[in-house]
Structure formats: structure tokens, C-alpha cells
Amino acid sequence: MKRLVYFMGGVLVIIVMLGILSVKLSADTGKSTLKNQLTIYNWGDYIDDSLLKKFEKETGYKVNYVTFDSNEAMYTKIKQGGTTYDIAIPSEYMIDKMISENLLVKLDKKKLTGFDNIDKRFIHQSFDPENDYSIPYFWGTVGIVYNDKFVKQAPQHWDDLWSSDYRDNIMLVDGAREVIGMALNAQHDSLNSTDMGKLNLAYNHLKELTPNVKAIVADEIKQYMINNEAAAAVTFSGEAAEMVAENKHLHYMVPSEGSNLWFDNIVIPKTAKNYAAAYAFINFMLEPKNAAQNAEYVGYATPNVKAESLLPAKIRNDKQFYPDNQVIKNLEVYKNLGPDWLGIYNDLFLQFKMYRK
């Protein structure tokens, strides 16, 4: 937004500044004030901006795009009320939680066009069994990015990361479910385990990984790997795709014993005001051409099979990011384990981080 430098006349200053403040407050809170406005609550840079302009041109709706940086921040804002979002894009475990707390609108499927374009493998998931509340937007995995300049033999299993060859050379994503889940999968247990014995074994196994861990970070992983500053990293497939595109020595794989299959889905929050605009946007994003353009821009895998067929061959045939059924069958979606078990996962992860120090 351009900054207005000066005004002519004191009264005009006050009037214009009040107007700017009103518009800014509307954008910051996500509150829809116009019948032709659609307020989208999404992750930053998680849609091709040219698609938003195309949507506005085709439908006449004005898009107000508001961002969040975590599922928890998004959930809190919607649960508190007082703000209105017509569309949101939460992850699967948060959708489960929001459904249970009656925070989402049950979709009228008669108003949907293009739902049949969604890959049958990615519907009827445990967090929304009948897809009554959500439509898949992007999907992906958690796996290992490795650098062939440092790694003698490509990893095949989670336990390969425990090798002394990786001493002080592994980056871990800063997430309790991801890191504890990795340790659970390494011992062939479910990453949704609520068995305290198995969780303690996973924690003890993680402690043995400590000499190999260079850092536990979030977005910084990308630059470390692109700049050849680490041999391997545990991260999300979408982030990995960006790394691989920037450095020819980087590769991504999902361990055969299992990992996380994640989803970000489109939902309509219960506080939505413009249902017509919300359905128009969902249907717009279900169109194969639009979904393909979005997937190519963002770099994440599209669940839209017709859109996938429109992607360049080098993208749709890349098994690193569009794995086959043999890989997918061993993946698990994170379940909403409830606050008590989530607290245990967080505590174990915090203990691991403190143990490293």
C-alpha cells in the first residue's frame, strides 16, 4: 500500500485519515463490510495473486485477503468471534477440532461444482469422513531432504538419520508432532500413538539423535539446505520442493516405514457472512485450470486429479512430491489427540530440545 505523504487542509487530513483507518481496520480484522466482498483467511503466499484478480474479474466479488502464521492463531481468531472470515484454509487436525467445536459450516454439496475432480484417495479422511465441512486444497508429506554432496548413500529409513555419518549435520523442523512422530515411525509405531510406553521409547531414541542435530528451526531450514550448510533435514514436502528447485544436489524422500500425510482444506467458518461468495470461490478453485495454476505457483501438490494432468510433466511425474500408492498407503494423517495428549507431545519435544543444550 502506498503511503500518503501530504494533504491539503486540516479537515481533509482528518477525514481521509479516518477513512484509511476504517479500511485498514477492516483488512486487519477480516471483517466483511460489503455484500460483494469475500474475506479469505489463509497462510501467507499460499495462493497465486493473479488468481484472486481473475476471481474478482469473473465474479464481481472484491477479495480481502488476511493471513495467519499458524493453525492455532487462525483457530483462536475464529473462536473468539468478532471477526468475519468467509473462507479459511486450516490443516487436517485443526479441522477435526473445529468440527467438534461447531465452528464450521456444513457444506451444501448441491452448490459445489467440481468436487468430483478431487482424487478419491484424499477424501473420506478421518478428520472429515464425508467431507461435509472441507474441500482438499493442497496435500503433502513429511520426509527427508538430503544433499548428495555430503550423503554417501541416500537414506531409505528414518533410522538412517541416527548414523554417525550425519554428526552435527541434520536440521529438524520445529514441530512436536513432526519430530516425535518421526521417532515413533522410526520404531514402527503410529505417529498418533497414545501409548505412554511407546512415547517414552521414542523420546529416548530421540535423545540418541542429539549428536547429529545441527539445529531445530522453522523457515531457516530452507536457506541452510540451499546453501549446502547441512547434509539432511526433516521437513514438509512443499518446503522441500522449493529447496530441490534451488539446488541440484538436494533430493527429497519419504521413509518406507511411514510418515505424515497432511492436508490443508478449504472451509467456511460459522461466522461467515457471504456464503454466496464463499461457494463461488470454492467452485473457482475446483476448476482444474485454476487449481493447476495455483499448484505450479505455490509448489505444493494439488489433490485435483484433472488439475494434476494439466501440470508440466516434470512436476506431475516427480515421485518425490507426487508419490505413488505404495508410499501413500504407509502414511498417516495427524489426529486431534486432545489437549492432554497434545500437551504430552509438546512436553516430550521441549525436553528433547532442552536435552540438546
Where do the model's predicted regions map?
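Periplasmic-binding protein-like
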Residues: 202-208, 246-270
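Ligand-binding "clamshell"
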Residues: 99-106, 128-132, 243-254, 316-319
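A ligand-binding cleft/hinge motif common to bilobed small-molecule-binding domains
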Residues: 94-97, 226-227, 232-249
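Conserved C-terminal helix/tail region of periplasmic/extracytoplasmic solute-binding proteins
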Residues: 325-357
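Early extracytoplasmic/lumenal segment of secretory-pathway proteins
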Residues: 9, 22-97
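Extracytoplasmic ligand-binding site segments that recognize negatively charged/polar headgroups
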Residues: 84, 89-212, 217-229
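Mature extracytoplasmic/periplasmic domains
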Residues: 269-329
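N-terminal Sec-pathway targeting helices
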Residues: 1-14
